[in-house]
Amino acid sequence: TTTTGFSSTQYQNWPICSQMILFILSFIGGCAGSAGGGPKVIRIAVIFKLGGTSIRKRLHPNAVTRIKIGGDSLSSDTVSSIAGFIGLYLVTFAVGCFLISLTGKDLITVCSSCILTLGNIGIGLGGIGMDFSFSIYPDWAMWIFSFLMLVGRLELFTVFALFTRDFWRS
């Protein structure tokens, strides 16, 4: 499945484990610089390295650790910004899922719909797969999906900055 929703195979007929892998990959998104949505592979790599560094700091509290990508050390501000982005992405996904769950659809359909729109990807599971559409949702849910698509495509910090007082003051 592509970011345009074009699909070349009936992935909904695949085993559940394979569908789960697709769902997890939906959270990763494309590579840096790609048109695909999601947090991007580089941010996920930094988060995994941050997790490893945190474990090492627990074992060796006095150790000085650095997170490196491609041989270059990342500043603590950069790592903090990436962690904040991932946290905000997950909170946005969770709030979207909660709001869409009010439609009464099943959990797989709700979660798949939210990550599909937030990540701007084409993989829909449950009631919105290849043979189904978003017409199963009421009109108010479409507004939430539209917001998730906008946030996912324009980047979280950019859109949420519009809702801060500081943005409008300066």
Label each PLM-derived region with a short phrase:
Residues 1-170:
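Membrane-proximal intracellular helices of multi-pass ion channels
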